[in-house]
Amino acid sequence: MISYVAAVSKNGVIGREGGLPWHISSDLKRFRDITMGKPVVMGRKTWESLPRRPLPGRRNIVITRRRDFASEGAEVAASPEEALRLCAGVPEMAVIGGGEIYRLFWPLVDRLYLTEVDLEVDGDTHFPAVSPGEWRETERELHLKAERDTASFTLRILDRMTKK
């Protein structure tokens, strides 16, 4: 199964200048819980934006067109197809961004773990549009803004009803 893990603003933004335009502590814990023990697939820019590399307890697979790219703790894939081969036989792989990588895997994704952030923000990276007719919501949980959080948010799990 191919899953996406993403935090998305009300206007579809997932990033700004190589980082997240918000801070939500409990969402970072949820991200860790969802991805722990699974291969995480990301683009080079997402890899470079991580405060700690590699993400511990997970295979870190970085998709990049840079033939000379190497980084300790990262397995490198030149294409989505190569990343899929590296993940062959695993029950679930988690695609964690960025925008270009989400677009490349979009026809193949089975599940979305979304954190919908109750903000409209400026940003330079966006999440693909989610068509309601393609997805069935299996879980929804509202969280009000905590003291150290930027905003309230809703945690959702959506499963694709039919593949493209």
Task: Please state what every model-predicted region is.
Residues 1-164:
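Enzymes that bind and transform nitrogen-containing heteroaromatic metabolites
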